[in-house]
Amino acid sequence: MVSGIQPEASQGLRPGGLPEGIRAAIYAVAFAVALSTWFIEIRAPLWLDETVSMFLIKGGWAGIMSRQVWPDAPAYSCLLWLWTKVMGTGEFMLRISSVLPMLAAVYLLYRAARELFDQDVAVIAAIVFCLHPIIIFAAIDVRPYAFAALVINATILTLVLLRHNHSNWLAALFGFLAASIVEFQLLFAAILPALAVCFIASKIGDRKTLWRQLGIALVVFTLAFLPAIPRLQYMMHTSGTHVFSEAPRLLQLVSTITVRGLVIILVVFVLVAAARRSLDLRNHEGQWTVLLCISLALVPLLILYGLSVGTSIHVFVPRYRLVAVPGIALCWGLVVSWMNSRTLRLLFCAALVVVAACVCFTAASFHRHMYSWKDALAFAEKNASVDNAPVLICSDIPEADHMRMPVGAAIEETGILPPLSYYKLTVPVAPLPRTLNEETIRAGSMFLQQQAERRFLAMAFVESYGTLDWLAKAAGASHTVHELGVFDGVKVLEFVPR
C-alpha cells in the first residue's frame, strides 16, 4: 500500500530530496505504528455490549433468527457465529474477528483516496483513519462496527469508481452496499443522504446515465433493504427504551472532526506550507471531490448530532459516530493535498503518527477498552458457590427498565443479563431492572421475602447503585449488609441473615 510512491509532476508537486525507497519505508513504518495502536487492549475482557453479541449467537443459526427483533445485526451475528465455530470463543480470537475486517476497511479507504489524491496523500488519509480513537476502539470491539466500516468504505470506493463508469453492475453493487451499511447498523443510515447527493452530482452532466444507474441502484437497494425493515420498525416503536446516554455537547462534535485535537498538527503544517509558499489551494481535485469529502464527514455527523440535541433519542455516542470517520479521514487528505511539497507531507505524517502513538500508549483512556463484569462475576462465583447462595443482579441494559422481570429459565432466554452469556455463574440468579422503579421494588421485595433466612449477594454497575442502597435499607431488619468490593465499577454486596 505504501511502496513505490511516485511524484505527481502534473499537479505542480514539488519533488522531495529523499530517495523513493526511504520515503516509502518511512510511510510503511508510520502505517505500522498507526496499526499498533489497535492492539493496546487486544486482550481486554468483554464489556456489556460484546456479551450481548455472544448472547445473540448462543443458540446458533436458529437462535440468531429467533432474536432478530433485538436491535442488532443478524448478518453480523451469523458471521461471528461462523468465526467462533472455526476459531473458538476466546477473548483474543473474538477480537481478531473485528481486526481483520477493519484492516480490509483501511485498504478500501486507501483505494478510494488513491482515486482522488496522490498516493502519499492516500496513505496519509488511511493513517488518519487508523489513528482515529473511534476506529481504535471499533477495531477490536466484538460488535458489528468493524464490518460496518468495511461496507462503508466499500460503498465509498464504488461511488468514486462510478464517477467515470457507465456499468449497470457497478451501480447495482453501489445500491447493495449502501443497503448493507444499514444492515450492520441501523443508525448508519445517516450516511445515505451524503451518498445519494454525491452520486447524483457525479452524473449531473450525463442525465441519461444518471437515471439508468440511479434506477438500478434504487431497485437493488430496496430489495437488499427489505430484511432490515422489521428491525427498523421495532427500533422506531421502542426508541425510548434504548436511550442510555446524555444529550451531546458541541465539544464532542468538534473532537470527532479534529481527532481529539490532533488537528493542531495539521494546522501547524498548513501554516508552514503557506509560509514557504508550498500551499496550493487551487482546486486540482475538482469540486466533486470536495463535495464528497465534506458530505461524507459532516452529513452523517450532523444528522446524529441534530437528532440527539433536538429529541430525547440521544445517539451521539462514539461508536455511532464511526459512520463519519471515513469522510473525516478523506477531509484530512484533502487538506494535506493542498501542500504541494512532498517533504512537508512526509514530515506531517511522521509528526502525526509520533504524537498520536505517544498519546495512545501513555493515556489511561486507551488502556481500558470498556468496563467489564468479568472480575465481579468471577468473585461472585467463588464467594457464592460455597453455600450456593443466590445472586441478585441489576441488569445493565436500558431495555430492562421496560420489562417484567423473568424467572427461572426465562432469565437466560430473554438475555436480560448478557454478561452471563459469556462469564458464567453456577449459582441461582435473579435479575432486577437497571434503575430503581416500580418493577425493581416489586421484584426486589419478592426476592427479599424468599431469601429472608438465607445469605445472598447483590451486584450492580454505577447506574444501579441506587437500587443497592434501597436493597440495603429494605433488608436492614433481616440481614446484615457488607460491601465485598467494587470491580471495574461493579459493586458486590453480601447480605447475611441476622
Model-assigned labels for residue ranges:
Residues M1-P19:
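Short, Lys/Arg-rich, polar N-terminal cytosolic tail immediately upstream
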Residues P19-R498:
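Terminal, non-globular segments
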